[in-house]
Curated annotation (Swiss-Prot):
PANTHER family: SPONDIN (PTHR11311), SPONDIN-2 (PTHR11311:SF15)
All residue ranges annotated as the Spondin domain in the record: 31-221
SS bond partners: C35-C171
Positions annotated to bind Ca(2+): D160, D188, D192
Identification of the protein by name: Spondin-2
Primary localization: secreted
Glycosylation sites: W283
Tissue-specific expression: Expressed in normal lung tissue but not in lung carcinoma cell lines.
Gene: SPON2
UniProt keyword list: Calcium, Cell adhesion, Disulfide bond, Extracellular matrix, Glycoprotein, Immunity, Innate immunity, Metal-binding, Secreted, Signal
Pfam families from the UniProt entry: Spond_N (PF06468), TSP1_spondin (PF19028)
Length: 331
């Protein structure tokens, strides 16, 4: 048997190297799984607001404006795109959305990412919810190369607070998930330093990263979500995605349908009652000592209620205190 020539051996080696390179290029990076499901899948997405005065009694917005949710804005994308991520800085577009609910710049950023990197398959949106408790929904489409879903909804009113999902994968190996449901909690976009729902605009300089707001962080009594008696906040919203049984076809964005009062959640049995303790001011200075000369008199000081208790929270303490004293300026 003839030995292969050096040229033939080199050709085989180059061929093997090329095949290995192509194979490596097709592998996911960073442990990312490969989606081999059917090319397309369509889902309904339902956002449910759970921001009630019972679950979140502290500083609950009742007017100008009352508690509500902005429109939902999301995208089906690949791992090359990120709409937002915890512990990272938000883009200018997401800053505008989180602070003012303006979606134009964020839409342009998503569009640019889709054109430059082919990383976005489709954009979807759902109408705003005009109250803290209510629902809104839309439809979206994903495909093998764009199986991740991200979205944001602004908390209204708030400095720069929002809820959302970052890169939820609807593909599970060779099949699409039938459904997915997640509880949602508030996040701070890191662009405004306001502590309360109705805080005036106060830009964070330098800009901070996205952080989750918890019952103890920020650790300040003025914060609207500060509930030191709770280990964790109850979910402020929930999202549910359900796969639709329809034959794949060209995706047509759904026409927006404004939510009606029929969508409001009225089942109070499932709403957690978050206790809100009474908060009072510091004591005032002692008043003048009153009484007759040669005898002990009394003086008093007062304080006032800053936050009324709710949902079996700790009651308010005494608001006036007296103490014995020696009258001044006796003649």
């Amino acid at each position: 048997m003839e030995n292969p020539s050096p040229a033939a051996a080199l050709g085989k080696a180059l061929c093997a190297l090329l095949l290995a390179t192509l194979g490596a290029a097709g592998q996911p990076l960073g442990g990312e799984s490969i989606c081999s499901a059917r090319a397309l899948a369509k889902y309904s997405i339902t956002f449910t607001g759970k921001w009630s005065q019972t679950a979140f009694p502290k500083q609950y917005p009742l007017f100008r404006p009352p508690a509500q949710w902005s429109s939902l804005l999301g995208a089906a994308h690949s791992s090359d795109y990120s709409m937002w991520r915890k512990n990272q800085y938000v883009s200018n577009g997401l800053r505008d959305f989180a602070e003012r609910g303006e979606a134009w710049a964020l839409m342009k950023e998503i569009e640019a990412a889709g054109e430059a990197l082919q990383s976005v398959h489709a954009v979807f949106s759902a109408p705003a919810v005009p109250s803290g408790t209510g629902q809104t929904s839309a439809e979206l489409e994903v495909q093998r190369r764009h199986s991740l879903v991200s979205f944001v909804v602004r908390i209204v009113p708030s400095p720069d607070w929002f809820v959302g999902v970052d890169s939820l994968d609807l593909c599970d190996g060779d099949r699409w998930r039938e459904q997915a449901a997640l509880d949602l909690y508030p996040y701070d976009a890191g662009t405004d330093s306001g502590f309360t729902f109705s805080s005036p605009n106060f830009a964070t300089i330098p800009q901070d990263t996205v952080t989750e707001i918890t019952s103890s962080s920020p650790s300040h009594p003025a914060n609207s979500f500060y509930y030191p008696r709770l280990k964790a906040l109850p979910p402020i919203a929930r999202v549910t995605l359900v796969r639709l049984r329809q034959s794949p076809r060209a995706f047509i964005p759904p026409a927006p349908v404004l939510p009606s009062r029929d969508n409001e959640i009225v089942d109070s049995a499932s709403v957690p009652e978050t206790p809100l303790d009474c908060e009072v001011s510091l004591w005032s200075s002692w008043g003048l000592c009153g009484g007759h000369c040669g005898r002990l008199g009394t003086k008093s000081r007062t304080r006032y209620v800053r936050v009324q208790p709710a949902n079996n929270g700790s009651p308010c303490p005494e608001l006036e205190e007296e103490a014995e004293c020696v009258p001044d300026n006796c003649v």
